[in-house]
């Protein structure tokens, strides 16, 4: 497994880095020790005949991608030499027209000339293995991409820029400092006294525990921001739950009638409220019922209430409260 890991790391990889949909621009990325050899085989400049492997790092070049003598597309090519790239490897980025067929054809040519298809997340994996980012930063890359609101994006960017890493390093540094003091005292008890040190150590440990608990709480809050707050609308039948859902999403998502028990299954929608994502679920009206289908809906509603982050309880003020409330 270790030998396979080393082998995979030295191979040159390639993938389509932009969305696989028709758009103005597409991006194909190549990374590895043979990246410049691969691009030399398939790229010809618009003017001159200088090989890209002879060009400086962080330069952009205009020309065409060829499959032998056939022009595939007109492109811009960005060169990044190791270690000054995302993966800390030689990296080539081909900016082409954004048609899905064009991107696939260019990738096929790249693979035919010495690269292999990248595995999902392999560029970020290499950035981690090569020491460009740590584990928390590697995790935050996908969080940035999948951010559903401004708060999640800000939190992910802070983590990507090393905010979490800095806090962990600070705690680790203090622990190492105390361990070093204890070891020194054990090695040289005549000159280093640990009288009364136990009480001070407990105070230090308590403070570090407080910091770690704050980080854990912050992580849990961050998860809510990233994934969205699961919000369940509950109440008796005909209390106005579906009308509230429609008002929140700004369209008629749920059927609204005067007949009680119209909503049988769970209706889910997602809205952004002042930068916070709410995963809203409209549920069946909660009441005692002999209807088999409606009872399944009521059971689902009660199950969602137990798992909800936030509950909106809807009451019809025109009627008196009863046992179903």
Positions of PLM-derived features:
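Residue-level signature of catalytic and energy-coupling elements of molecular machines
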Residues: 28, 94, 182, 212, ...
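Switch/connector loops and helix/strand junctions flanking conserved nucleotide-binding motifs
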Residues: 36-38, 103-104, 287-290, 320-323
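Conserved G1/Walker A P-loop phosphate-binding module
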Residues: 42, 188-295, 300-305
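Long, non-coiled-coil amphipathic alpha-helical linker/lever segments
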Residues: 132-211
């Amino acid at each position: 497994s270790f030998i396979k890991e080393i082998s995979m790391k030295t191979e040159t990889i390639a993938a389509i880095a932009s969305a696989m949909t028709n758009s103005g621009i597409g991006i194909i990325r190549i990374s590895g020790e043979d990246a410049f050899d691969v691009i030399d085989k398939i790229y010809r400049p618009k003017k001159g005949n200088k090989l890209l492997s002879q060009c400086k790092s962080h330069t952009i070049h205009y020309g065409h991608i060829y499959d032998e003598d056939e022009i595939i597309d007109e492109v811009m090519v960005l060169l990044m030499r190791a270690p000054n790239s995302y993966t800390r490897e030689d990296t080539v980025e081909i900016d082409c027209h954004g048609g899905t067929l064009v991107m696939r054809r260019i990738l096929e040519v790249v693979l035919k000339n010495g690269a292999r298809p990248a595995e999902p997340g392999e560029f970020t994996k290499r950035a981690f293995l090569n020491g460009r980012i740590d584990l928390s930063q590697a995790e935050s890359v996908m969080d940035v991409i999948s951010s559903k609101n401004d708060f999640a994006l800000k939190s992910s960017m802070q983590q990507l820029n090393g905010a979490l890493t800095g806090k962990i390093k600070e705690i680790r540094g203090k622990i190492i400092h105390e361990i070093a003091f204890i070891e020194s005292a054990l090695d040289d008890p005549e000159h280093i006294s640990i009288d009364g040190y136990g009480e001070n150590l407990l105070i230090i440990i308590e403070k570090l525990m407080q910091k770690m608990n704050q980080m854990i709480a912050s992580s849990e809050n961050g998860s809510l921001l990233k994934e969205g707050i699961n919000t369940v609308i509950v109440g008796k039948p005909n209390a106005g739950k579906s009308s509230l859902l429609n008002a929140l999403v700004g369209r008629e998502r749920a059927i609204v009638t005067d007949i009680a028990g119209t909503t049988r299954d769970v209706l889910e929608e997602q809205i952004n409220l002042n930068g916070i994502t709410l995963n809203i679920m409209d549920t069946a009206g909660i009441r005692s019922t002999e209807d088999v289908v409606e009872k399944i809906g009521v059971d689902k509603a009660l199950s969602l209430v137990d798992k909800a982050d936030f509950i909106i309880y809807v009451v019809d003020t025109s009627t008196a409260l009863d046992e179903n409330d």
